[in-house]
């Protein structure tokens, strides 16, 4: 019987340090805390030490990403030394009997690709494919589970609709075009991985959110229906049916896109209440009395159960690729983990095939706009000395791994 995957997740830019060739905004001073992502956690140099933290948690898997801009600093020039670094990481994980879950793209892009328009460029799926074709042969012998793209909807919305992330665009039309190109980039990547190793298991890490009507009004309910479909369903629909529906595309069908995921990777954090607004797509409203995380969104781990039940219709296995909480005082995190794992247990009892859980994150790290102010880690990091210390919630998670027999 296949073992349930217990693990944590990180991303290259947030933990490695030394990423000087990508597009992230600290170079323009747009990080709220004015923090720099260097040296971050120095995971690039300390990964062996950090893998011991994974063993401390009794985990048998680890999700991490490679940094495109390290490997291909200039278009078409691939740094073999950097590729070998990630091979070393994979080899070390295998030695420790830790299943690697490898993410090929986690938000950042090389500067040369940014100058070409990034994922707005019609040629971006081909450009990304060229990168993937180069690196996958090095990793294929070590990796069974692949994530092609992390949170494509988040990347498109925050970077191209709201303008909070690079490149700072504020255009619904452009964000939809980016989503379409990310769908096609996934399609090309899926083919490359499967060509290299047929038995590989491939997906995206899909951020999913619960939307509720702020009022018991017809228009609020219509907004909820629209947002749930746009945010949660349409991307997955494209990867299962092969049809890129409006507004992401023009209802066009790609045979290579159909059934181009082997499981569904789910990133779940919270729910939001929304109301109709005549001048906006929606308006978010906070309910009185709800508990908030340090990030400002609602503490609602129970929502994972509803998300998992909603996904049952796809008839795919499910991996929780991220689930976590910013909690500097570590007062809520242990309970959050317990309730999240209980949600998985209840969903499995309803016939949902969940085969793993990755807590976000292994350790405190560089949060995209908030710098080092948001503490997601099971391990606290002193960013002056880079010392790692387990929080109480690390012991909670470790004990949960021991006590649950999925």
What are these regions (language model features)?
Residues 57-83, 102, 112:
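Aromatic-lined carbohydrate-binding/catalytic grooves of carbohydrate-active enzymes
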Residues 46-67, 259-264:
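Catalytic domains of carbohydrate-active enzymes, especially glycoside hydrolases
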Residues 10-12, 53, 66-70, 106:
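Short glycine-rich, polar/acidic loop-and-turn segments at beta strand-coil junctions
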Residues 24-52, 57:
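Aromatic- and Gly/Pro-rich amphipathic surface segment
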Residues 1-31, 35, 75, 84-406:
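Active-site region of glycoside hydrolase catalytic domains
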């Amino acid at each position: 019987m296949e073992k349930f995957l217990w693990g944590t997740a990180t991303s290259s830019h947030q933990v490695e340090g030394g990423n000087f060739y990508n597009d992230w905004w600290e170079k323009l001073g747009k990080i709220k805390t004015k923090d720099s992502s260097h040296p971050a956690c120095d995971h690039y140099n300390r990964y062996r030490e950090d893998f011991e933290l994974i063993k401390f948690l009794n985990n048998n898997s680890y999700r991490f990403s490679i940094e495109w801009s390290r490997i291909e600093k200039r278009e078409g020039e691939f740094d073999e030394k950097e590729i070998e670094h990630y091979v070393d990481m994979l080899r070390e994980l295998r030695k420790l009997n830790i299943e690697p879950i490898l993410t090929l793209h986690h938000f950042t892009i090389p500067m040369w690709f940014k100058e070409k328009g990034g994922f707005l460029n019609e040629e971006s799926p081909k450009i990304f494919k060229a990168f993937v074709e180069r690196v996958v042969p090095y990793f294929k012998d070590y990796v069974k589970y692949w994530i092609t793209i992390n949170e494509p909807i988040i990347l498109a919305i925050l970077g191209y609709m709201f303008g909070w992330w690079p490149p700072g665009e504020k255009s619904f039309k452009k964000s939809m075009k980016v989503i379409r190109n990310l769908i096609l980039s996934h399609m090309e990547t899926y083919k490359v991985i499967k060509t290299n190793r047929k038995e590989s298991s491939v997906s995206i890490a899909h951020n999913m959110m619960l939307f509720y009507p702020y009022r018991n009004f017809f228009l609020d309910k219509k907004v909820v229906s629209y947002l749930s479909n746009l945010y949660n369903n349409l991307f997955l629909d494209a990867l299962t049916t092969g049809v890129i529906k409006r507004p992401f595309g023009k209802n066009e069908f790609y045979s290579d896109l159909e059934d181009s995921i082997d499981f569904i990777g789910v990133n779940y954090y919270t729910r939001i209440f929304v109301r109709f607004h005549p001048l906006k797509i929606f308006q978010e409203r906070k309910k009185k009395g709800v508990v908030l995380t340090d990030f400002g969104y609602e503490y609602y781990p129970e929502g994972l159960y509803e998300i998992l039940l909603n996904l049952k219709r796809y008839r795919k296995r499910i991996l929780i690729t991220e689930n976590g909480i910013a909690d500097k005082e570590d007062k809520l995190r242990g309970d959050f983990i317990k309730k999240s794992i209980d949600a998985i247990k209840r969903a499995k009892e309803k016939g949902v095939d969940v085969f793993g859980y990755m807590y976000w994150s292994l350790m405190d790290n560089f949060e995209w706009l908030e710098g080092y102010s948001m503490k997601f880690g099971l391990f606290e990091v002193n960013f002056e000395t880079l010392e790692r210390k387990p929080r109480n919630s690390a012991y909670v998670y470790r004990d949960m791994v021991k006590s649950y027999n999925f």
